[in-house]
């Protein structure tokens, strides 16, 4: 699934204007150079856009009036709009965000010492992981840079306007929402560059996390493009189980996937030498003590910490959530091998905002529901 590289020439809107949210700093400087302006003007505008969540050129008071007028003629700052908001009893907020005639979902998760934003990268998902609600919606398209960074921009603007209520500013971003980020590299990477940029959101590379189910060629590319924290959606201790619940494993098996992870760690400073393993706990599928021993053996050569995720149900799902006692036994086995093991606290499940529950509103170009009814046919995933 290849993507055209984003440039100022291919990010114009219907009215011929360039949405500046589609441009990272290098592209923004090229844009201002083409306007006959000095590169530092790009830095000024980005600071207004991301430090102050400003989308009105007239409010950028350190930019001269002539340039502001020129910008209004050729450019705009247009983030996708929130069309629905749901608030959980635990403080989690889920926003449905309009992207064209469809919706993706973005989740704000406040904690005592941080606030994490879970961001979507695609409308739907093509990977068909059996335990994930997003995967059941099918796949429509990749999100543009402006639609990815626009989720962060919109959330930051909402949270910033609500400081009087005590909401914590966003400190962490995780690419764990709808979609597989590595199948949209050419939009995800510039968006993450803006998250890290001092004139963007200025986040530490250790506080921006990309999660992948294992698109190995793209993971190798990622290591040459950007350094961010990495989480891998493993979810199984062997290929037999993973083939069933994470079908991309049939193309890139666990051994191949973990080898790519180790290659990424060799290039990365953000991960401090270890990767986060995500492992959803499915009752009597992958949660037995024998599975824990297999997982420990599997990961012995991969420096990591392990997040055990109680499965979050959705309608018509064929699984059950592991009991607390089974999760506890599983965790103790892993810790006996010396692995740092954390049982993730479920957040936002009362508003379907928890891990694996995001669905949005997807016009399915893969016609997945129809195919499943008629043929049970699996989608073909092309390498990036």
Curated annotation (Swiss-Prot):
GO terms for molecular function: 4 iron, 4 sulfur cluster binding; metal ion binding; rRNA (adenine(2503)-C2-)-methyltransferase activity; rRNA binding; tRNA (adenine(37)-C2)-methyltransferase activity; tRNA binding. One of its GO terms (cellular component) is cytoplasm. SUPFAM superfamilies: Radical SAM enzymes. Binds 1 [4Fe-4S] cluster. The cluster is coordinated with 3 cysteines and an exchangeable S-adenosyl-L-methionine. Keywords: 4Fe-4S, Cytoplasm, Disulfide bond, Iron, Iron-sulfur, Metal-binding, Methyltransferase, rRNA processing, S-adenosyl-L-methionine, Transferase, tRNA processing. InterPro entries: Aldolase_TIM, Methyltransferase_A, RlmN_N, RNA_MTrfase_RlmN, rRNA_lsu_MTrfase_RlmN/Cfr, rSAM. Its cofactor is [4Fe-4S] cluster. Disulfide bonds join 118-355. Belongs to the radical SAM superfamily. RlmN family. HAMAP family: RNA_methyltr_RlmN. This is Dual-specificity RNA methyltransferase RlmN. It comes from Escherichia coli O157:H7.
